[in-house]
Amino acid sequence: MKFKKFGKALLLSALSAGIVLSVASCVQSYSVGYLYVTGTVTAQPAGNGIISGFQIDHNTGSLAPIDLLPVSSGGANPVRAVLLTGSRFLYVLNRGVNASGSADCTTANPCQNSNITVFAVGGNGVLTPQETFFTQGINPFRMIADSSGNFLYVLDHDAPSSAACALALGAGTTACGDITAFTVNQTTGRLQLIVNAQVTAANGSALTYFPVPANPVDFAEAAGNFITLSGGTPATSYPYTGGTSVFPYTFSPINGQLTINQNSSQPLGITQGTAIVYAAGVLYVLDNEPVAINFNGTQTPAQSQILPFSVGANGALAAETGGNVPDDPTLANPIYLLVESKGKFIYVVNQGNNVAGANAASGIAGYFITLTPAYQLSFIPGEPFGSGSAPQCLVEDPTDQYVYSADFNDSSVTGRLVDPNAGSLNNLRSTSTYALQGPATWCVVDGRTS
C-alpha cells in the first residue's frame, strides 16, 4: 500500500509531535521528596512552634510550599526532628519553656511541658499530628534514632535524680544528664519507654533512663556505641557548648539497651566542643575555640577545628592519621557536619554569632576526603560557601544533587547545587533562598513522595 503525499506529511507530523512530547517528558519537573523545617514562631495555639514543608524539584532544586503547611509542632521551641518507619512518621522534639515563659531554660529554671510529638506523613507530604510522648529527664534538647530506625533516643541535659547519677557513674557523682530511650512501633509509630536493665534507682525500682556525665552537649550512634560529648564547665543554658570529653555506652540492636563499658570519660584536649557527628565510619567532633589563653594570661584568637576519630572497642576513640583539621578561618562556631552521599566531600555548617545584626561569620566550609595513603581533609577551592545567617542544619536531597540549610537569623532556607566533581556548592538555577515564617531550628529530608 502506498501513501499519498498528504498522508505521508500527516504521519511525519505525528511522529515529530511524538518525539517532541517524548523529549519534553524526559525533562518534566517532578518532586523527588520533601524538606521539613522546624521553627520557633509562637503564633500557634499555646505558643507552639511550627513545622514548614517544601516539595523539592528534581530538575532545579527549587522549593514549593506543601499544601496545608506550616502546622503547629505540638509544643514550644522545637529543636530536633527525625523521620522513621519508611518516612511514614515524623517525630519532633519540643523543648518547652521555663516558668517565666522564656526559652532560655537552665538547670535552676528548667523547661516545662517538653514533649515528643508524632506526625503521620501523608502521600502529598502533609503532616497530621498523632500522639505525644515525654522524656524522663529535664531540659531535653537532642534526639536521634539508631541506624535501624527501631529505637529513638533523647538527650536530657539534666537527670531527675542525683542519687541515680552516683549509682550509674560512680560514687561522688552529684549531677548528670541522661538519655531517654524508646522502642518504635514500625506499624503505628508509637513509642514505648525502654527501662534501664543495668542500673536500678536508689529505692530499688527500675531506672527509666540512662545517666550520662554532667553538662552533655550532643550525642551520636557510632559503630555499635552511643557516645556523648560532655563539658567539664557547666553550660546551664541552651544552646549548650563547652564539650571537653566523650563517654560511651555499648548499644544493643536487639532491645535498644545502653550498657556502660567504662567508668570514665575520654578527654579530647578541647574546651569548646559544640557537636558530635558520625558519618561514613568516622566520628567527628566540632570544636569552637574563640580564644586561646597564653601563659601570661593574655588571650589570642584561636581557630575552630574538626577532630576526626575512628571508633574502637568499647567506644574508645583514636585520632585519624591526618589529625585535627582547621575550620575555615573566616567562619566561626561549627555546629553540624554533612558527608555527601558518595563520600567524596565534607561540609561543615558554621553558625557564627547567633545574634541578629552581628558579624555572623556564618557559612559552609568544604573539604575533599582523601582516604589513601592516610585519612586527610583538604579545603575545596572556592570555599567557604554561602548560607543564610546562622544556619542550624544541612541536608542532602534524595537525588544527591542539592543541599539545603535552614537559617535562624534571617528565617530562611538556602539551597545549593553540588558540583559532583569539584565539590563546590553553587547557586540553584532558580531562586536559592526561600522565606520561612520565623527562625529555623532544624531540618530533615523525606525521599518518599507517594
Give the positions of each predicted feature.
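Bacterial N-terminal signal peptides
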Residues: 12-22
